């Protein structure tokens, strides 16, 4: 294992010999540390609690934004409807960017990394008129779409990932941000016969957030956005030679109440997974804050896990794909 000093002074720079990039504070409780270059296959973005210890963004950040952090699975508290609708979102991909970043579900502490396909870094294509992702894209922590459980609404099993979130606020967020969002609705994408829920939400700190309470408010105040969202998800794999994606409910966006049921169900499945009550497959459930989980580790063990990550090369790959535009016929 390498010493911590090289990890901080070498691994965080944009190039060899660069000054260390200090951990970036995220909201009030979380910050991030970069290991390697963002355009390299060994790039990792690790999460730390503001107290200084490493955590998993998948397992250690509470699902509910009003939840007190305890060394246990967070328990719900009675709140009014608006307050009950506040959730934490982990931002993986900022709006207008193309790099397919994601929580590494199979790696200890689940850092964010760029997806790799056929040995190359994966970029989402620009399909005219959209540049990259048209929302801030990320995930709800402490949720899991179980690949062994058939969804009663879609009749398809889950995609083995945390639930995805499309944040529609006006601000472009940063990779690794942890923001409080209001849930507005959901879209059920069927990807290779798997259910892949897309939650529509808005950052509570967005200037327009007070106007949005349910999916119909998106239609009212951001006309065309839901249609663009549906079209984006239908077409984004076409430039790779794949067919258009399909949707449950004929592509209908479901309302907030429906979305909350989807989230609650995925949270219950996550609880079973992190307590080793179901088959988790290759997913890493290593966590720091859930003391009664069989996968719990100490803060010192979490630090050792990060220190044991091989020193990354600072070589970056070409990102030509980000500049290519695709024009598709109707």
UniProtKB/Swiss-Prot annotation:
Cellular component (GO) terms are: mitochondrion; synapse
What CDD domains does the record tag this protein with?
pyrophosphatase (cd00412)
Primary localisation category: mitochondrion
Q: Which residues carry this modification: N6-acetyllysine?
A: 219, 256
User: Alphabetically, which GO biological process terms does the record hold?
Assistant: diphosphate metabolic process; phosphate-containing compound metabolic process; regulation of mitochondrial membrane potential
Tell me the PROSITE patterns matching this sequence: PPASE (PS00387)
Entry keyword Nucleotide-binding = no
Which Gene3D superfamilies did the record assign?
Inorganic pyrophosphatase
Q: Which residues carry this modification: N6-succinyllysine?
A: 211, 254
Catalytic reaction equation(s): diphosphate + H2O = 2 phosphate + H(+)
UniProt keywords, alphabetically: Acetylation, Hydrolase, Magnesium, Metal-binding, Mitochondrion, Transit peptide
**Binding, Mg(2+) 2:** 164
Q: Name one GO molecular function term.
A: inorganic diphosphate phosphatase activity
What EC number is given for this enzyme? 3.6.1.1
**Family annotation (Pfam families):** Pyrophosphatase (PF00719)
Instruction: State where Mg(2+) 1 binds.
Output: 159, 164, 196
Which cofactors? Mg(2+)
Start and end of the transit peptide? 1-27
Protein purpose: Hydrolyzes inorganic pyrophosphate. This activity is essential for correct regulation of mitochondrial membrane potential, and mitochondrial organization and function.
Identify its protein family: Belongs to the PPase family.
Which PANTHER family would you find in this protein's record?
Answer: INORGANIC PYROPHOSPHATASE
What is the protein named? Inorganic pyrophosphatase 2, mitochondrial
Q: Which organism is it from?
A: Mus musculus
Lineage of origin:
Eukaryota, Metazoa, Chordata, Craniata, Vertebrata
**Gene this chain is encoded by:** Ppa2
């Amino acid at each position: 294992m390498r010493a911590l000093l090289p990890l901080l002074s070498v691994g965080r720079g944009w190039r060899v010999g660069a000054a260390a990039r200090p951990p970036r504070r995220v909201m009030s409780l979380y910050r991030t540390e970069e290991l390697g270059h963002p355009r390299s296959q060994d790039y990792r973005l690790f999460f730390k609690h503001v107290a200084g210890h490493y955590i998993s963004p998948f397992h250690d950040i509470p699902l509910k934004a009003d939840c007190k952090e305890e060394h246990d699975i967070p328990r719900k508290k009675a709140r009014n409807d608006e307050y009950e609708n506040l959730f934490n979102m982990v931002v993986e991909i900022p709006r207008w960017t193309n790099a397919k970043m994601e929580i590494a579900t199979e790696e200890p502490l689940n850092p964010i990394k760029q997806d790799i396909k056929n040995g190359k870094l994966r970029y989402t294509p620009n399909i005219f008129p959209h540049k990259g992702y048209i929302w801030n894209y990320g995930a709800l922590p402490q949720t899991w779409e179980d690949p062994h459980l058939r969804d009663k609404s879609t009749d398809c099993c889950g995609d083995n990932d945390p639930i995805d979130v499309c944040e529609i606020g006006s601000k472009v967020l940063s990779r690794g941000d942890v923001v409080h969002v209001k849930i507005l609705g959901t879209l059920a994408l069927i990807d290779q016969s798997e259910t892949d829920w897309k939650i529509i939400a808005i950052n509570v700190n967005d200037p327009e957030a007070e106007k949005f309470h349910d999916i119909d408010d998106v239609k009212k105040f951001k006309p065309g956005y839901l249609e663009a969202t549906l079209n984006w998800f239908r077409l984004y794999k076409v430039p790779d030679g794949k067919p258009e994606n399909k949707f449950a409910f004929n592509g209908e966006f479901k309302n907030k109440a429906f979305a909350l049921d989807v989230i609650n169900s995925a949270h219950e499945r996550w609880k079973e997974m992190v307590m080793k009550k179901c088959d988790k497959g290759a997913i890493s459930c290593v966590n720091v804050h859930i003391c009664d989980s069989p996968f719990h580790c100490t803060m010192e063990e979490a630090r050792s896990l990060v220190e044991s990550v091989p020193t990354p090369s600072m070589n970056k790959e070409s990102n030509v794909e980000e500049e290519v535009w695709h024009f598709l016929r109707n």
